[in-house]
Amino acid sequence: MPQLTKNYIDTGKVSIEIHDFPLTQIHSGALMAAQAANCSAEQGQFFLMRKTLFDGVVNKEWRDGSLDDLTTFGNYAAAIGIDRAQFESCVTTNRHLAQVKADLAMAQQLGINSTPAFIINGRLLMGAQPYDEFAKIIDAMISPP
């Protein structure tokens, strides 16, 4: 992703939108984690929290969306410089739940059933892909006819 960001997003050639697709059938706490990432965005730390959440699930630091997970997410927030009280209030009041659920419904309508998934100008690209695959598709779309 850093190379894509540098060559396409930072140069203004393309823009990026990130939508939630919490895999609750695998991680029952994924819905809370998606909300935690969005609550972190309110304080300018979306990407760092997102990485922290992914690292945390891999390390089995959280799992089921319980109060223990909320405590873990609050610890993550504090560690990356987020106001913990504001963050926890955002998560516990489900401030972003409607948007997360709307993103999930949109993904399901598009036939997305796993992550990662990418939509590039209407074209669905499933699974992790090398930089060259993204570059080939993007270059074909932005090149003059």
Regions found by a protein language model. Name each.
Residues 1-78, 110, 139-145:
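Structural alpha/beta surface segment adjacent to cysteine/selenocysteine redox centers
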